C-alpha cells in the first residue's frame, strides 16, 4: 500500500488491456488477399476438416482466418473481409472471414441465421 506522498510523486499506472485481435488495429474489419486456402484438423476431443485461409491484410500483416458455413468459393488471390473472433478448437485462428462480402459468396440454401452467412431471403418465404 503506497503512502500519499508516494502517490503524489509517482501516481497510479493504468493497466493496458491486451486486444484479442491485434492485426485489425482497432478497426471493426479489414480487407485482405487470400494467400493459401486449406483445411486443418481441430484440437483433441473434436474431429473434422475445418476450412481456413491464410490472408495478407491491407496493413501487410498475415493472419489465419476461419471460413464459416457450408461450402465456399475462396481460392488464392480472392479478396476477403476479415472480422475478429477466434475458433476455440483451432489454435492460432483468431479471425473470421465475413461471408457475402467482396469475393466471398454467401452460404447457399441457408434459411436460419442468414445475416451471419451473407444469405439472401429465399423467394418462397411465406408471409408471417
Curated annotation (Swiss-Prot):
Which InterPro entries does this UniProt record tie to the protein?
NA-bd_OB-fold, Ribosomal_uS12, Ribosomal_uS12_bac
Q: Which GO terms describe its molecular function?
A: rRNA binding; structural constituent of ribosome; tRNA binding
Q: Which CDD domains match?
A: Ribosomal_S12 (cd03368)
- State the residue spans of region: Disordered: 101-128
Please tell me one Gene Ontology term that the record gives under cellular component: small ribosomal subunit
Q: Which residues carry this modification: 3-methylthioaspartic acid?
A: 89
- Which superkingdom does the taxonomy of this entry point to? Bacteria
Sorted keywords for this record are: Methylation, Ribonucleoprotein, Ribosomal protein, RNA-binding, rRNA-binding, tRNA-binding
Compositional bias (Basic residues) at which positions?
113-128
- Record carries keyword tRNA-binding: yes
Biological process annotations from GO: translation
Function of the protein: With S4 and S5 plays an important role in translational accuracy. Interacts with and stabilizes bases of the 16S rRNA that are involved in tRNA selection in the A site and with the mRNA backbone. Located at the interface of the 30S and 50S subunits, it traverses the body of the 30S subunit contacting proteins on the other side and probably holding the rRNA structure together. The combined cluster of proteins S8, S12 and S17 appears to hold together the shoulder and platform of the 30S subunit.
| Family the entry assigns | Belongs to the universal ribosomal protein uS12 family.
Subunit structure as annotated in this protein's UniProt entry: Part of the 30S ribosomal subunit. Contacts proteins S8 and S17. May interact with IF1 in the 30S initiation complex.
- Please state what the protein is called: Small ribosomal subunit protein uS12
Q: Which organism is it from?
A: Prosthecochloris aestuarii (strain DSM 271 / SK 413)
> What's the name of its gene?
rpsL
